[in-house]
Structures are given as C-alpha cells and as structure tokens.
Amino acid sequence: ERRQIIGDREISPLDVYAGRTWPDTIAVSRSNFDTHGYTIHPLFLVAPPDRESLDAWVSLGALLPRGMNGVLVTGLGLSGHRDVMPVLRMQACVQNHSFAAALAAVAALRHDGDVRAIDLPALQRRLVAAEIMPPEALHHGDSFPVPDADLRAAAVDLASYRSLALLLAHPDRSLPLLRQTFALGADSDRNRTAAMLLAALGDDTGADVLLDMLRADQWDEGWNYRGMGQFGASMSPQDRAIVLLAMCESERATDRVLAKAARLDADHAFSHHRAVAMFCEHFGDPETAPLG
C-alpha cells in the first residue's frame, strides 16, 4: 500500500476498462490487476478483476500535482487510484513514462519550470519517434464523457467490464438506464448486476436482490488476506452484498447483517469481518457497538 499524489488528472480502473484516452497522453502501460492485497474500488464489488492484461493510457496530468508548479511525480507515486496501480507499475512502463517526464522537465526550463506551458505536441511526437507510445496517441482527446448511445448499450449489456466501467463513470445518466434494466427483470444474472451497480451509485432500487443474497444462515466461502499474486475477488458474494447495501444506505439490512455478524469468530475469513466492519462504520449505529 502506497501513497499517490492528487494530480491534474487521476487514472482509475474505470478509465482502464473503458479505454479512456487523454489529450495529453505520454505513454501506454500494460499489465493485469495483480492487486497485492484487497481491492477497494466499487467496480470490483460488482465484478472482481480477472487475469486479463489491459492497456492503460497515461496522461501527463497524472504526473502533475494539482495546484503546484515545478514538480513532476513518476512511478508508483503518480495520480492514480490504488486499484489501478497494478496496471501502471510494471518496470518498463514506469521507465517509459519517467522518460517522458524527463523530457517534459527539460522543456519546462524554457518556461521557468512550468510543465503545463510546454509544447505538448512536440513532446508527444518525440515519444512516438522513440516508440514510447503509438502514433494514434497524437490524435487523442478526452474520450469522456461518452455519448448517450454508448450508455444505453452498456445498460442492456452488463456483461463486459467496459459496460460496467462506462456506467459507473457516468452516474447521473446511468441511473435512469439501470433502473429501466432492473425493472425488466428478464434475466436473473443481469438483474443482480443492475442491482449491484445501482447500489454502488447510492441507489437502493435493487436492495431486495442484495438482501436475498444474505438469506442463508451460514457464511459463504470468504477470502483471507493475500499479498503477492492476488487475482480475482477479495470478497465473497455475501461480503459484497453487505458493503453494497451500506453504499445504497439500506438500513433495512441492519438486522440481517447483525445476525450474520453474530456468527463470526476468529476462524472465519478476513473478508467477512471486513465487510461487517465497513457496514457498521458506514451507518455508525450504536446498535452495532457490541460487535466491536
């Protein structure tokens, strides 16, 4: 676990899965979500990461601390969400964006150290010539926000990481579309995914679906902390339902979560304890105090 700057831009898992491009692209990174611990982004409550390698476009703005001049931050300190760092941290990728940062620093000497004032297209052309990034990056703009048609298609699909990322990245426009998808109720898997996305966006329309995931008296198979080589889910389905119910402010879940919590002991998986703790922390209900 490391500390990152807050930059002019922050790269997130949603950007990676959606293939988001930037007008100030300086490199492309590639890896998978080998997270070294547990994930925290809401996307991974809906769909845990898999082992597929992905490309991530790196923005110069992610190297620039917001509100500061004369500073560039590279490597694992750049402005990115904790869960996206596995895709950005490979040695060759860090060397590439650090090379770009060095060129930007030299160019900034002509502007009293102001990196934001440099000739960005000239820097990008040099990076293409050095094969740090492909020529297509010269024509990048910010691909967000996406058109309404893309969100409508994503709300019907709900099967790909890209669809989930697009919907979570555009909450105001996604919520009515997800409510429509949930209301159709034609497919149980898609309905569950819609309910989880809604909850991740703070909407309790599908709370009953999540509550149903907690009906079993016994806990499901949880997850114990793993550092290196951690792929996939770091929470069980029940754990994820508990956290999502907190995110959508469903206090109806309190009794059920407390009943589940009463069955926990030191032999149960770490993820169950974490999920209950997150639920209790969210509501701050004195009724949960004995669990401490």
Regions found by a protein language model. Give the residues of each.
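Short, solvent-exposed loop/turn segments at the edges of secondary structure
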Residues: R66, D267-H268
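Structural detector for internal amphipathic alpha-helices that build alpha-solenoid repeat scaffolds
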Residues: A159-D172, Q180-L184, D189-D203, W223-S250, ...
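Short beta-alpha connecting loops at secondary-structure transitions
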Residues: D83-V87, S188-N191, A216-E221
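Amphipathic alpha-helical scaffolding segments comprising HEAT/armadillo-like alpha-solenoid repeats
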Residues: G141-A155, P171-G185, D203-G227, S250-R263, ...
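Flavin (FAD/FMN)-binding glycine-rich loop and adjacent Rossmann-like elements that form
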Residues: E1-M133, A137-A153, D203-D204, D285
